């Protein structure tokens, strides 16, 4: 999204030059900033950013189109919508501005107004899709059974339609009606410039819809997700300690087991916090500087001749590209999970370089994120006194037509059914064996003494 302003300082006539001479349009066009080498380097960096954005988001769309089990998951509709909005950023927004950055002038004439509308629409759609994903994950985690009943394809498409409709309403209508400008000068693009000074009303209102309200929603949902995960991690830890105490009658051995369980619980909580910090940190780092300037610049006094602008064009453009760079990072954060990675390796034909059980730590296609540790060490299940009353895990959701690679999920605070624990972790891009924490049965009132922890308990190790 872009908010441009341009202030040209008057030039004093030099000796021997008629001060009343006619200035041609070509002389009005600002010269490119920096030398040839600087502009060449800028072009290479921007080209690499555009290509990476195109490849990453195209892979996401291709994977969903090609593999039926990815299409069968309703939550992947939000990931695809995000990928489409980021593809539009890479096709409709980035290239035109990159050419202008290298050339130093706007070369596309009256396409300027349409480009500004595309810029606002695509950037807003990308951010609103991120907000929709956070809301979807919170609903799935806070009340998983109600979520499974209510999150139909129709409802998912309705949420996506609302996000795109808002994006179109705050972009094309104001821009085409010229409501967004602080002045009525619409001929800037005819002079080799595509800078539009946003008026204060539009700058504030569009920033609220495009960024500030969505970021508040995301902070709230991810904070709540962390608290839910933290509660369930501690509940699982108490179950592990109870099972260990039943199996180990010697007091000193039980004490050692308790200490180890507490350390494991702390490491799991740390991994949850790190993952959610990466999700929010990348988004805020990319977009916050731009939207701060977007609201500050319209209040700058740029009418005083001879005074420098409060924010330089170079600084503003850098932060604009930081925001667009978020579109190249979204596929890595939101689509690099077990399901998508298997699809990517198949599409790219590089499955022989990765084990078939290779997984990623962050999973937004099923629950929120899935935890898979980076070691092959496993602990054998510890039989306790209640082993003869072993409770079998609940079957997985039959509604998923494809293979389910996610072994861990989240339980709500008030849920009375046995569910899997979701333990997110930091993104891992190496080919690693999959180790998971199988289902641990418990009730809403806490661990039951007669329950045995079935399956294998993963050894988290040091981060």
From Swiss-Prot:
Disulfide bonds join 112-194. Residues 66-76, 136-154, 224-273, 338-463 are cytoplasmic. Keywords: Cell membrane, Disulfide bond, G-protein coupled receptor, Glycoprotein, Membrane, Receptor, Transducer, Transmembrane, Transmembrane helix. This is D(5)-like dopamine receptor. It holds the Pfam family 7tm_1. The chain crosses the membrane at residues 40-65, 77-103, 113-135, 155-180, 199-223, 274-301, 316-337. It is found in: Cell membrane. Glycans are attached at residue 6. It is a multi-pass membrane protein. It comes from the Eukaryota. It comes from Takifugu rubripes. Receptor for dopamine. One of its GO terms (biological process) is positive regulation of MAPK cascade. Belongs to the G-protein coupled receptor 1 family.
